A protein has these predicted regions:
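Electrostatic cytochrome c docking/interface patches
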Residues: 17-36, 98-103, 107, 139-143, ...
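Short, structured secondary-structure elements
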Residues: 59, 91-94, 98-100, 108-375, ...
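Coiled-coil termination/hinge junctions
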Residues: 409-451
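Positively charged n-region of N-terminal signal peptides that target proteins for export
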Residues: 1-4
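Local sequence-structure signature of Cys/Sec-based thiol-disulfide redox active-site neighborhoods
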Residues: 27-44, 51, 59, 320-325
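Bacterial N-terminal signal peptides
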Residues: 6-17
């Protein structure tokens, strides 16, 4: 046999295997594809609820699900995995989920579970709890294409899928993209022509810097944040009365434009009133704690609504700052995330010094609603005008002290009247002022009428450890 021919034959299985590997679907993603199935179809009987759990089997915890004594899931061994046998059996008495549950698995779900077990039943933590790690830059063929490290990852995926990078955008497209990305607005007249005349990397960098310095950049970024914190100018219930909170919106815009560090951005919103010598801006930031649906009907049960407001704050803080949904834990331990009812109410205790009792008592159905505590503030333009007026008044008064003159007296009077008129245009905005904290209890199954739950102190979820004292 020809040696070259023999070598080709010997390599054929390797080539075939490589080609087959390329055609295989990607590994099953536990968080995206398996966890939702288990949560929807299995956890009601094999989840965290002790009273409803059957067969002493938990499928919400990896250790229990893969317990060799139970053989519910045997990684890589489909026919020895009780879960697979139960979801594929024709015996209606043995099949899972049971008929009386009103739930059934689709053929696609069964196929996903089967593939997952065959692939080793790999478990994954929720992405929000996985510490970030540095990844090695992928090798790429078009080494001249990437202009930054992130381009290497982009190109790596493109090449892996057998595709080619899109051609570079033309100058007009590039200008339009950067304007919409950074300001949400189309280019102003002349901007496209100017860049077309000089489409160099330095010109592009200068354009980006100019747009980042624009007030519209803060407006663009603030839109995302305001959606997250459920900003609204009305109370949100059936009457949907107006309330005064627009200065908080302006504070968010200003914060993005000023590149306020995120830790400071967070601290001022959650507890700006507790900072030493809190500024007007820091008090405005505490309006975050007042951004929730509120009722001002005469017949509301204060205790019920205080419980609702506390739960709303925990839901929003956990979603916005922790990338998590703690709402389930208001009534019971979360189905698969590591949150308990104690965690939920310990988080609520952080906000027990927000005086919701006073808010309910002082609020009315008038337009706009009266929502103490409030402060009156000027907008950016008005603050600049006030600064100029104060400077002019001080200068005139200094001259008057040296050389008294009737015309100076008249000018000072006019400036002071202008200042007083400007102050009258100030807007009210809701803020937070800490009061004596309410006692916070775990509400069994979220029932605000049930005071039998234990008292909890402010604390972060237990699995996160303890809060540093700062001393």
């Amino acid at each position: 046999m020809n040696k070259t021919y023999g070598l080709l034959l010997s390599l054929l299985p390797l080539v075939t295997a490589a080609a087959s590997a390329e055609n295989l679907p990607p590994p099953v993603d536990f968080n995206r594809e398996i966890r939702p199935i288990l949560s929807d179809k299995c956890f009601s009987c094999h989840g965290p609820d002790k009273k409803k759990r059957k067969g002493r089997l938990r499928l919400d915890l990896e250790k229990s699900a893969r317990d060799p004594k139970k053989s519910a899931i045997v990684p890589g061994k489909l026919e020895k995995s009780e879960l697979y046998l139960r979801i594929t059996t024709d015996d209606t008495d043995e099949r899972m989920p049971p008929e009386e549950s009103g739930k059934s698995l689709t053929a696609e779900e069964i196929e996903l579970l089967s593939r997952w077990i065959t692939e080793g039943a790999r478990w994954s933590e929720h992405w929000a709890y996985v510490p970030p790690r540095k990844h090695k830059l992928p090798n790429v063929k078009k080494t001249g294409w990437p202009t930054s490290w992130i381009d290497r990852f982009t190109l790596g995926h493109i090449e892996k899928s057998g595709q080619e990078p899109a051609p570079d955008a033309d100058p007009v497209t590039l200008v339009r993209r950067v304007y919409f990305d950074l300001t949400g607005l189309p280019p102003e007249p002349g901007a496209v022509d100017a860049f077309q005349a000089n489409p160099t990397p330095k010109a592009y960098e200068a354009l980006v810097d100019r747009l980042l310095a624009s007030e519209h950049y803060g407006e663009r970024m603030a839109a995302y944040w305001l959606d997250l914190v459920r900003f609204a100018d009305t109370v949100g219930y059936h009457g949907d009365q107006d309330h005064s909170i627009s200065p908080y919106r302006d504070w968010v815009i200003d914060s993005f434009n000023a590149d306020l560090p995120f830790d400071q951005f967070t601290r001022e919103q959650l507890a700006g009133d507790l900072l030493p010598k809190a500024t007007t801006g820091q008090l405005i930031a505490t309006g975050y704690n007042r951004l929730l649906q509120t009722s001002h009907e005469g017949g509301v049960q204060a205790k019920e609504y205080i419980a609702m407001y506390a739960a709303d704050r925990v839901r929003n803080v956990s979603q916005v700052w922790m990338g998590a949904t703690m709402g389930c834990a208001q009534c019971h331990a979360h189905k698969y995330d590591p949150y308990t009812a104690r965690d939920f109410y310990a988080m609520a205790a952080f906000f027990a010094d927000v005086d919701d009792t006073a808010h309910l008592k002082n609020g009315t159905n008038s337009l706009p609603t009266r929502r103490e505590p409030e402060i009156s503030v000027l907008n950016r333009k008005q603050r600049r005008q006030l600064t100029v007026l104060d400077k002019n008044i001080a200068n005139k008064q200094a001259l008057q002290a040296k050389t008294p003159a009737p015309e100076l007296t008249a000018e000072i009077k006019t400036l002071k009247a202008e200042r007083a008129s400007l102050q009258k245009t100030a807007r009210k905005t809701m803020i937070t002022r800490a009061t004596r904290p309410r006692v916070t209890r775990i509400l069994p199954r979220g029932d605000w009428l049930d005071d039998s739950g234990p008292v909890v102190e402010p604390g972060i979820p237990e699995f996160m450890g303890t809060i540093a004292s700062g001393k």
